[in-house]
């Protein structure tokens, strides 16, 4: 099954940088498309991407949570740190000298689209992007968190576009407990907007989110110091950490982007039985947002097409960003080509 949903009307100029010692090139660009969205009708959108690797190598698309973007890791062309820095590099499963790595900015990530965004829309946008880049099939789609949801949609809507899906900490539906967390976070933003303090509302939402991403065990180890009285108020040990997380997020995220992509997680629903692509599901025991039971249900629904790996980590939903060696070992096996050795 495949869906004809959009046309690319322009390929914007791109930047190309060669690294002569390895043949690795880094390309950034964008395309303008007309996309028929599930809840918002026909929309004119820009799809921004970064493609890094050796010409002719198998292509792996890597997509993260709603805060992720097209820049995966520092490279010769774009030296700034990326969101997947610990997972990409020489000797890793995601080595640009052996794979071409494709990253893209989610629809809505620029904050310009004020409409409901479905994970199906993201998958359809990827299919259009692959057409524009003349990529017939991805060797692999590695999706973490929200990226895993998008990967499931791509596997259903455009199954011939990917050979294998690796879905980390992302299920076929949002857990009601996690949806309640996100609803309260969006209310925090709305309260800030009512008080003309939008950035404060977004910072508070991010601080709530940090509690759901991590685990009580980690907080127990890191923030067990007694509270302090500061300017007549009691301040607990974790507050500096939470304040910093909120400030960093506000500095790089537009409010509308956060709201619409947060909603997109809660709109997500797929039937696991509709996935025909071989899928490796990676679960984290202790993940409060995507519990192990939901990922077991996903794998059961996938049947013979699905397999499951379970990690135990104090980092909960953020384990894919913190347990990079363990994730890399899983990816190395999952993405191995015929004839490749470990």
Pin down the residues of each PLM region:
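Alpha/beta-hydrolase
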Residues: 22-23, 186-277
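N-terminal cap/lid subdomain of alpha/beta-hydrolase-fold enzymes
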Residues: 50-107
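Conserved acidic catalytic loop of the alpha/beta-hydrolase fold
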Residues: 120-140
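Flexible "cap/lid" loop of the alpha/beta hydrolase fold
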Residues: 166-195
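Short beta-strand/loop motif that positions the catalytic acidic residue
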Residues: 275, 281-283, 287
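Catalytic active-site module of serine/aspartate enzymes centered on a nucleophile-bearing elbow/loop
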Residues: 305-342
């Amino acid at each position: 099954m495949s869906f004809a949903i959009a046309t690319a009307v322009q390929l914007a100029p791109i930047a190309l940088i060669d690294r002569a010692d390895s043949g690795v090139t880094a390309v950034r660009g964008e395309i303008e498309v007309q996309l028929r969205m599930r809840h918002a009708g026909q929309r004119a959108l820009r799809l921004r991407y970064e493609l890094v690797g050796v010409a002719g190598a198998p292509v792996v698309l890597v997509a993260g949570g709603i805060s992720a973007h097209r820049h995966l890791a520092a490279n010769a062309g774009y030296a700034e740190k990326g969101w997947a820095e610990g997972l990409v590099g020489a000797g890793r499963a995601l080595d640009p000298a052996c794979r071409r790595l494709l990253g893209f900015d989610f629809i809505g990530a620029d904050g310009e689209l004020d409409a409901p965004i479905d994970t199906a829309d993201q998958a359809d946008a990827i299919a259009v992007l692959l057409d524009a880049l003349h990529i017939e099939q991805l060797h692999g789609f590695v999706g973490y968190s929200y990226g895993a949801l998008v990967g499931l949609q791509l596997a259903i809507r455009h199954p011939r576009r990917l050979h294998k899906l690796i879905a980390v900490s992302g299920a076929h539906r949002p857990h009601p407990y996690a949806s309640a967390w996100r609803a309260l976070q969006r209310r925090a933003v709305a309260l800030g907007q009512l008080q003309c303090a939008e950035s404060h509302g977004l910072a508070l939402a991010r601080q709530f989110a940090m509690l759901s991403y991590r685990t009580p065990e980690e907080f127990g180890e890191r923030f067990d110091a007694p509270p302090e009285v500061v300017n007549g108020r009691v301040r607990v040990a974790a507050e500096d950490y939470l304040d910093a997380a909120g400030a960093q997020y506000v500095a790089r995220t537009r409010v509308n982007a956060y709201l619409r992509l947060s909603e997109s997680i809660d709109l997500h629903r797929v039937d696991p039985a509709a996935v025909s692509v071989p899928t490796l599901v990676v679960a984290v025991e202790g993940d409060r947002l995507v519990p192990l039971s939901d990922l077991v249900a996903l794998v059961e629904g996938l049947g013979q097409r699905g397999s499951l790996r379970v990690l135990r980590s104090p980092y909960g939903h953020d384990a894919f960003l913190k347990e990079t060696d363990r994730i890399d070992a899983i990816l190395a096996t999952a993405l191995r080509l015929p004839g490749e050795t470990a």
